[in-house]
Design a protein with these regions (language model features):
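A short beta-loop-alpha structural element at the N-terminal edge
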Residues: 2-17
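Conserved GNAT-fold acetyl-CoA-binding loop/helix
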Residues: 20-46
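A short helix-loop-beta-strand connector motif used in the catalytic cores of GNAT acetyltransferases and
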Residues: 43-59, 81
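Conserved beta-strand in the GNAT
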Residues: 59, 65-73, 81-86
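A conserved beta-turn-beta hairpin within the catalytic core of GNAT-like acetyltransferases
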Residues: 74-83, 92, 111, 142-144
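Conserved acetyl-CoA-binding loop-helix of GNAT-fold acetyltransferases
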Residues: 87, 93-106
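Conserved GNAT acetyl-CoA-binding A-motif
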Residues: 101, 108-121
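Conserved catalytic-core motifs of GNAT/GCN5-like acyltransferases
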Residues: 115-119, 134-150
Length: 156
């Protein structure tokens, strides 16, 4: 079982490499090239550090090596978004995504939210659907922005 901790300054270089590598080696097979290029350019070490400063970023490690990450940000009253949730390609399919999402969804901001949402790549839709996320635009339908949005609403 992997360990999960909060981001510490200095993680940004490794996280940037992880995010970019997974985009190129996994997501590029399923997503439009323009989307991959935009995300690749977005996930510089500097922007990863800024994302961590603005949100609650979690880092998953195995044997001291970083193998995954995800961030929770507040996007509105009683609403949060999970962003930049990625695993290294060799870590996919081993249950680590489930472990990571258990921690992300237990984050205090998610606990307080009525709605948790995220944007998904095509290859991750099954994973999110199994976790109870639905697409508000319709089953596997891209929104007007071209993105696949998934959400989970809590009944209170």
């Amino acid at each position: 079982m992997a360990e999960i901790r909060r981001y510490i300054p200095g993680d940004e270089d490794t996280l940037s490499v992880l995010l970019r590598r997974t985009l190129l080696e996994v997501n590029a097979h399923y997503c439009p090239q323009g989307e991959i290029e935009w995300l690749y350019n977005r996930y510089t070490p500097e922007s990863v550090a800024q994302i961590a400063a603005d949100g609650h970023t979690y880092v998953m490690t195995e044997g001291g090596a970083i193998v995954g990450t995800g961030t929770v940000i507040v996007t509105g009253e009683l609403e949060c978004e999970i962003i930049a949730a990625f695993l290294l390609p060799e870590a996919i399919g081993r249950g680590l995504g489930t472990q990571l999402f258990e921690v992300l969804e237990a984050d205090e901001w998610c606990e307080d939210a009525n709605r948790i949402w995220l944007t998904s790549s095509v290859n991750a839709l099954d994973f999110y659907e199994k976790r109870g996320y639905v697409n508000p635009c319709g089953y596997r339908t891209r929104g007007a922005d071209g993105l696949l949005t998934m959400e989970k609403r809590k009944k209170r």
